[in-house]
Amino acid sequence: MAMLESYLKKQVLVLTADGRSIIGTLRGIDQTINVVLEKCHERVYSDEGIEVIPLGVHLIKGDDVAVIGEVDDELDKKLNLKEIIAEPMKPIVH
């Protein structure tokens, strides 16, 4: 939990258990890893490049969080998302 608190007010990427990739500014987190992101968007991967879907403020339930990581803003801005070809992530299977 303390590690995640160091990400507050920073840009993070959240990978969800159903395979979604959501990027935004971490505004809140609780003991069950419920996550509040602001200014966020989802990146949908396909063989036609990455589609960016604006979400605004978004709450992700802790049960749905697979991974949270800090995003390097400078590197992220250099990416040409239309040129990145990738299959969508598959959901986590327990």
Swiss-Prot record:
InterPro entries linked to this entry: Lsm8, LSM_dom_sf, PTHR15588, Sm, Sm_dom_euk/arc
SMART domains the record matches: Sm
Domain Sm: 1-74
GO cellular component, one term: precatalytic spliceosome
One Pfam assignment: LSM
Single biological process term from Gene Ontology: mRNA splicing, via spliceosome
Xref: Gene3D superfamilies: 2.30.30.100
SUPFAM superfamilies listed in its UniProt record: Sm-like ribonucleoproteins
UniProt main location, coarse: nucleus
GO MF, any single term: RNA binding
Subcellular location as annotated: Nucleus
Keywords carried by this UniProt record: mRNA processing, mRNA splicing, Nucleus, Ribonucleoprotein, RNA-binding, Spliceosome
PANTHER family: LSM1, U6 SNRNA-ASSOCIATED SM-LIKE PROTEIN LSM8
Entry's family note: Belongs to the snRNP Sm proteins family.
Annotated protein name in UniProt: Probable U6 snRNA-associated Sm-like protein LSm8
